[in-house]
Regions:
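Residues that form generic nucleotide/phosphate-binding pockets
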Residues: 18-22, 37, 80, 84, ...
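Hydrophobic alpha-helical segments and helix pairs
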Residues: 92-150
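Long, highly charged amphipathic alpha-helices
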Residues: 14, 76-80, 144
């Protein structure tokens, strides 16, 4: 069985080479994101057979990130994750799979998997100028949130 472990800062040097091999522009493919969200989403990780494997498990929910590393090890990694799910008696599912990553899965396992897009999990992209000004209806909530933060968070001068 795969030995997943809690993500720690000390893992950064070991994990980064695998993440660097990805053609992924998602925040999910960065160590900072993996480390920062690992406590909230119960994310654990390990390096197995030339791939970085990540798992999120909360209660009965179990899901894997797309294995990171050299594509030649992808089939072995996915097979290992699938077996891990069977041993845990859970449905096999992956999260944050890009269309390009899904195409790789489809090459190895034709017709075996389906992709389901969940807009709530998408990364947000903003225009820097509009975000800096926070003008308009679209940014009204963000402007209120920022102003509220400015009221409730004392400046560094006031903290001493």
């Amino acid at each position: 069985m795969i030995n997943f472990r809690k993500v720690e800062l000390e893992n950064q040097k070991a994990y980064k080479p695998y993440m660097a091999q990805q053609q992924c522009r998602s925040c999910e493919c960065t160590f900072a994101n993996l480390y920062l969200w690992s406590r909230f989403y119960a994310v654990t990780a390990t390096v197995e057979n030339g791939m970085l494997l990540t798992k999120s498990e909360e209660g009965y929910y179990l899901s894997y990130g797309f294995p990171m590393g050299k594509p030649k090890y992808l089939k072995e990694a996915v097979d290992a994750l699938y077996e891990y799910s069977k041993e845990k008696k859970r449905k096999f599912q992956m999260h944050n799979v890009t269309p390009e990553q899904f195409a790789l899965l489809e090459e190895i396992y034709p017709g075996r998997f389906q992709i389901e897009y969940r807009r709530d999990y998408a990364d947000y992209v903003y225009e820097a100028e509009k975000l800096a000004k926070l003008s308009g209806k679209k940014y009204h909530g963000k402007k209120n949130h920022t102003n509220l933060s400015l009221i409730h968070i004392p400046s560094p001068r006031d903290r001493s």
